[in-house]
């Protein structure tokens, strides 16, 4: 069993900075701003070949109000999930009442807890941590997470010994029989070729949209638990939260993202980081659910976000949330507006749901699987070339400078999104209308749904281009006589 380590403490004591150090990523947003982390964030970490799961949490200070109450609940849930807790305090700020309250809660839970004093850079560590002995949690481990000082010592002298006590590493008996068996395996038959199948990989599903359209509510509804903070206030989610899950014997990684507003309205530095994280999550995903608020309709910002999704080549499912409570007349108006403004993406499934009450949510994953399967389906060169030939037979390419564009053959150039590469002569002169015709023909023939198709054209090289023939001596003499004859006739 992989041990779980939770990082807890007051806001802005450096939990996310240490999380990034331990996981060797920049997955957690970091800024000198209390309350930046709002949800539990999970990451894999390793020390001397031993893996453990690290949980970054929001801060607890005992004065929570509004959305901060939900943040504190997430932190308390992380403590329950963890096998061991790293309780972080701020050495510069000194001992605070909230530190004492957290220590009291940890003692009541009887969890293995190690006290970590952060921000000791530039201070005398021994003097900086004296006050924290009053918490009664034993030895204090001084670190400077932002510079990495003391982090390795924390791992080697605290976490590793604890892991050895809880789950000792199995030692291999290195006897003659073991080495003989290993040598026999190495000299035996070669391993069969790896038969890569994208269906065996988890589907990365990003849930995106404008602020407060119900993304986190939908995430919790799908998971069946309050996994992320939900609050009726735009900007509740600030980071992209990656959550592994399984549904109908298929593995997924659910990505709950921060809302994206118009660029002119994004003034807060933290929100700018959040938007970047959301756009990165879109590029990292296989399938994107774009959530639209039925009561506000589709906005220019929705279309802008949609354009980024399509340019990234991601598969798409459109989710119209807050459908409950609307009159039939309003529903018809919303559908007409969607048909008008989203007519250019007729390949994407549209679902009308209520994330709050759960209506329509169960049907989403059928479209997600359909989109992913379409985007990763392997198609042979023979089939693609045959489809291309049928398209040409139904509608010939246009004439360019008196010569008809010739398409020779087609093959797959990539997946997720599907890319079809067509080779031919003068293909760079094909008009956009014919390119769209080919794209739609391939989509219809391959029965592709939920994902964009990209067509790339490659020009056949002319071996005689930019080359001049070298005349033989006989040809040279003949040329001279011809030139002399022309001059005389003049």
UniProtKB/Swiss-Prot annotation:
GTP 2 binds at residues 209-216, 256-260, 321-324. The keyword Nucleotide-binding applies. It comes from the Bacteria. It holds the Pfam family MMR_HSR1. GO terms for biological process: ribosome biogenesis. Residues 3-166, 203-376 form the EngA-type G domain. GO terms for molecular function: GTP binding; ribosome binding. GTP 1 binds at residues 9-16, 56-60, 118-121. Residues 377-461 form the KH-like domain. Keywords: GTP-binding, Nucleotide-binding, Repeat, Ribosome biogenesis. HAMAP family: GTPase_Der (MF_00195). Belongs to the TRAFAC class TrmE-Era-EngA-EngB-Septin-like GTPase superfamily. EngA (Der) GTPase family. GTPase that plays an essential role in the late steps of ribosome biogenesis. Associates with the 50S ribosomal subunit. This is GTPase Der. The gene is der.
């Amino acid at each position: 069993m992989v041990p779980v380590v939770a990082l807890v403490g007051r806001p802005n004591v450096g939990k996310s900075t240490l999380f990034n150090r331990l996981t060797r990523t920049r997955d957690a947003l970091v800024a000198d701003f209390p309350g930046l982390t709002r949800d539990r964030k999970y990451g894999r970490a390793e020390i001397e070949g031993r893996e453990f799961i690290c949980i970054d949490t929001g801060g607890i200070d005992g004065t929570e109000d509004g959305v901060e109450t939900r943040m504190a609940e997430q932190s308390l849930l992380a403590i329950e999930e963890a096998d061991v807790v790293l309780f972080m305090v701020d050495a510069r700020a000194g001992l605070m009442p909230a530190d004492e309250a957290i220590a009291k809660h940890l003692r009541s839970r009887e969890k293995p807890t190690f006290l970590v004093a952060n921000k000791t850079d530039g201070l005398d560590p021994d003097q900086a941590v004296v006050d924290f002995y009053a918490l009664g949690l034993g030895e204090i481990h001084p670190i400077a997470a932002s510079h990495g000082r003391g982090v390795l010592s924390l791992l080697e002298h605290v976490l590793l010994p604890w892991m050895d006590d809880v789950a000792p590493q199995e030692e291999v008996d290195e006897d003659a029989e073991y080495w003989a068996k290993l040598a026999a395996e190495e000299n035996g038959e070669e391993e069969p070729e790896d038969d890569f199948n994208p269906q065996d990989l988890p589907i990365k599903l990003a849930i995106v949209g404008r602020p407060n359209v119900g993304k986190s509510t939908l995430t919790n509804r799908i998971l069946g638990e309050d996994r992320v903070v939900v609050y009726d206030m735009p900007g509740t989610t600030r980071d992209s939260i990656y959550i592994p899950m399984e549904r109908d014997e298929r593995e997924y990684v659910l990505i709950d993202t921060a809302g994206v507003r118009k660029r002119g309205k994004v003034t807060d530095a933290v929100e700018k980081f959040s938007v970047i994280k959301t756009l990165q999550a879109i590029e990292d995903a296989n399938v994107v659910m774009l959530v639209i608020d039925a009561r506000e309709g589709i906005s220019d910002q929705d279309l802008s976000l949609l354009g980024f999704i399509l340019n990234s080549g991601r598969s798409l499912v459109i989710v119209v949330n807050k459908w409950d409570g609307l009159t039939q007349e309003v529903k018809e108006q919303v559908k007409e507006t969607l048909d008008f403004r989203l007519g250019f993406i007729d390949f994407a499934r549209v679902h009308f749901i209520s994330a709050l009450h759960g209506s329509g949510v169960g049907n989403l994953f059928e479209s997600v699987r359909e989109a992913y399967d379409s985007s990763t389906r392997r198609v042979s060169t023979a089939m693609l070339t045959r489809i291309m030939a049928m398209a040409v037979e139904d509608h010939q390419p246009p004439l360019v400078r008196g010569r008809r564009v010739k398409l020779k053959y087609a093959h797959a150039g990539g997946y997720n999104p599907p890319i079809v590469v067509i080779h031919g002569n003068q293909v760079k002169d094909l008009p956009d209308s014919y390119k769209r015709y080919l794209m739609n023909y391939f989509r219809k023939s391959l029965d592709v749904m939920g994902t964009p198709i990209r067509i790339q054209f490659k020009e056949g090289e002319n071996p005689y281009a930019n080359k001049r023939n070298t005349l033989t001596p006989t040809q040279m003499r003949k040329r001279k006589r011809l030139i002399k004859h022309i001059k005389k006739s003049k």
